[in-house]
Amino acid sequence: MADFFDTLSDKHIAMCAKQPVFFVATAAEDARINLSPKGYDAFRVLAPNKVAYLDLGGSGNETHAHLAADTHESGGRITLMFCNFEQPALILRIYGRGRPVLPQDAGWTELAGHFTLLPGTRQIFVIDVESVQTSCGWGVPFMAYEAERPTLKKAHAQADPEQWEAKMKDRTSSIDGLPARATDRYIAGTPLD
């Protein structure tokens, strides 16, 4: 049975912090639904009703395009899902409205201070939480976490900044043609071990 909450509780926040992966879903009105897994230490709770996550440059920019396409003052619709792959069984969904904040945007410096910036950081998504849902998660399998995949961080760390910036400028539309803004700079982030 599902339970709904207006904000994130301390128990919810602790559950999210333990998960090595979470999932992000967005949908613009006339576009395909996008669903993406997210890893690394990229999720932060800014307040019980506000969360954010760090986004690295990747193969597309669907989330940005979907959130920007919505004219709602708080941004586009977004859902984040966390699954506990250990005990106790639990699924937690965060429903809200989100917006991208890029390095060239007002508020970037303060927001970025909540994260350890990784090589290739492209933007931070800020989500105003509208509701939180928990459900049993009994159908979610047990899975053991091994390690982060280092490939994306290594590729960004070894990138030529000018080539990386040019590549990100190519990520200015979704697969359905919705526009997305590009970051204006390469962020080297914290050196890798």
Describe the residue ranges of each PLM region:
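Binding-site signature for planar aromatic cofactors or substrates
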Residues: 1-193
